[in-house]
Amino acid sequence: MCRTVVVMNRTLLAATAVLAVASMGLSACSGEASSNSELVKSETSSADITWNDADVKFVQEMIPHHEQAVEMSDMLSGRDVSEETAALAQRIGATQSDEVRMMQGYLAEWGVELDPHAGHSGDHAMGEGMMTAEQLAELGAATGGAFERMWLTMMLEHHKGAIAMANAVVASGVEPRVRAFAESIVRAQGAEITQIEGLLATLGG
């Protein structure tokens, strides 16, 4: 009778030990699963973020920057300028009009409105290289060769400003399409700067 009790006690102890180990294993697995779940959640949240404040600022400010370039290009209509300058203005106007629509699409996709103050003369949000209302009025009043030289000089500064803005978002932005667009601005407007400098040299400006 005593031997039977001893055997039963040993059996109970063994069973209790097995249950304890199993419980610890389940707890560890649960903790690991919870940890993995949090990691996946964190990674998913990061993956969902495709743009940042630098991307938004760039697009909000580049839209009016481009719109001013289009406005300046339209000012050549009916003016007596060289064929090269006229062709350059036409290309700038067409290209940047398309790019404005593209950038407006980005803001709509992100659910972000265009900054109503961006690009306004005298405002802190005015894009780099943009002309003031007074400068545009002076350009409009110019005639002949003086107008062409002034237009090229202003567009040169305008392009340099756009490149500075583009380089900034390449360094700080995260949205792949915005970064690729900014890099294309650096290339295209860099080439146009070279062309403008050549035209100014020809005109003696």
Locations of regions flagged by a protein language model:
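All-alpha RGS (Regulator of G-protein Signaling) helical domain and cognate RGS-like helical scaffolds
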Residues: 30-205
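Core hydrophobic alpha-helical membrane-spanning segments
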Residues: 20-22
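C-terminal motif of bacterial Sec signal peptides marking the signal peptidase cleavage site
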Residues: 24-28
